[in-house]
């Protein structure tokens, strides 16, 4: 397939879509690839949303195009084109659903759009003809109106010469002023001044009858007059009504508060931040206790190891001298042993006392810190309870 033919068909499709006022975006990449999903939205819009006349035609022929998959949609479209538009596409259903045949698919879409626009114009012409025929039928029907009903509708006027004129094509009628009470000499079809005055009096009576209901409600008129005369009173009444509504809301809120108090009776309410602070302090105390226990055990182990090392240092040289030397060596070794036996316990006691004093100082400091933290937590609890 030549690329020039494909471009030409795409330009043709763009022109048809402009004349159709297609609002959505067109998937040109899918159309070039021959993807069926790119052309189905255009066909669906043209048949369902473009023309209300075409949509009515589909409804009358009981054709549904909504909520269907691609295969069923193409099947119904092909049937619709065959039955309503007398159009047979170049491709079969299987070929149209398959990928490919890009140029032929674009041509089919253009043909469908042109068929829809042509059908739309035909239906508009039929609708116009039917409406014109109805208007003609209505105008041809005679209006059932009597002569007595026509007279009030006509414009009435009196000429300067005393002639009684009407707006129609009737001849002017001369009013004869010289007549008896029995209307002798008055021809038929003439209208006298007495008749005109009688009609005016009847219309005045009708207007008075219409105005009677307004006069039947003097209380309403009095209230309206009071409102117009005293706008401050109306404003006060409105404010009073608003205050009453607010009082009702307050009573409802008080009842709800009482229910909440009854539900939370005996429970301690603590702020979330204070509670989190308290939990963090408790965890710190627990960790410090564990660390202090571990440090004490480590110090004891170190002290025991120091004592053992001191005892080993004191007794090992004595054994060596005793095994190697003679009499003099024995004398010297005995002196050394005496010194070591006197000095070793003293040094071990001193080291143990120093370690004990150091450990006591650290424990006292830790206890003071813990005491301070406990006091702070107690104050926080008091503040939260208040």
Swiss-Prot record:
Pfam families: CEP44 (PF15007). GO terms for molecular function: microtubule binding. Disulfide bonds: none annotated. Residues 11-194 are annotated as: Binds with microtubules and centrioles. Keywords: Coiled coil, Cytoplasm, Cytoskeleton. Centriole-enriched microtubule-binding protein involved in centriole biogenesis. In collaboration with CEP295 and POC1B, is required for the centriole-to-centrosome conversion by ensuring the formation of bona fide centriole wall. Functions as a linker component that maintains centrosome cohesion. Associates with CROCC and regulates its stability and localization to the centrosome. Interacts with CROCC. Interacts with POC1B; the interaction is direct and recruits POC1B to centriolar microtubules. Binds to centriolar microtubules. This is Centrosomal protein of 44 kDa. The gene is Cep44.
